[in-house]
């Protein structure tokens, strides 16, 4: 179909030099996209015309950035740890975000569902309706929280002009299935892949590159010499060969960088691990 989009209307060509004009009713939210199109930041995709509506997809024109630093992100059940390196392997910054709010969201809705099940056990239709209602609310709250986390991480990525490295979690389900039932339940609630999707989407929207790295043994090996790390107290791991002690979450971000760059050493950051609740 040949057409000409003019912002507030669309002209559909029916024959040479003949066309029909359709005036568009747009909301204030949709007007923002039209303004971006007028400014040359968006392109028009394939228009779909239905009986009562017209779907006009916009495509953002993205110019890929030349990165100056590298950001590695390790996503855990209780926290998200990220490190930023320069291209020589010097650690510029390492931060751990505690994501306890996510656990609280799941726990609160789990308690609500238990109460509903007990109260309406003899009213299956009403029970089903309410369970679906609260499941929807839980999903929206979780996604809103994940959006906020990913937005913060991308703001950090833009500040340092980075390429982002994350774990390739393609086979995470197979690994999780070998764990206990309680562990599987907790991990199924924590949607790692959805957070990664939000991060990648926002990163590419701003022209940042994203790569995935095989996470095998990233939390078990010394990033300096490659020897196996041994437990050395709460959340700490020690390399008996290098005689160095690492935070278990931080070492994963170091090894992600090492795997992607094939480098053998790191220079410690000037300041220690920064902690933050999100």
From Swiss-Prot:
GO molecular function: DNA binding; metal ion binding
Pfam families: Cas12f1-like_TNB (PF07282)
Any one GO biological process: DNA recombination
Binding site for Zn(2+): 222, 225, 239, 242
Keywords: DNA recombination, DNA-binding, Metal-binding, Transposable element, Transposition, Zinc
Domain of life of the native organism: Archaea
InterPro entries membership: Cas12f1-like_TNB (IPR010095)
Transmembrane intervals: none
Keyword tRNA-binding included in the entry's annotation: no
Zinc recorded as keyword: yes
NCBIfam families (alphabetical): guided_TnpB, IS200/IS605 family accessory protein TnpB-like domain
Record family assignment: In the N-terminal section; belongs to the transposase 2 family.
Protein name: TnpB-like protein MJ0751
Lineage per the UniProt record: Archaea, Methanobacteriati, Methanobacteriota, Methanomada group, Methanococci
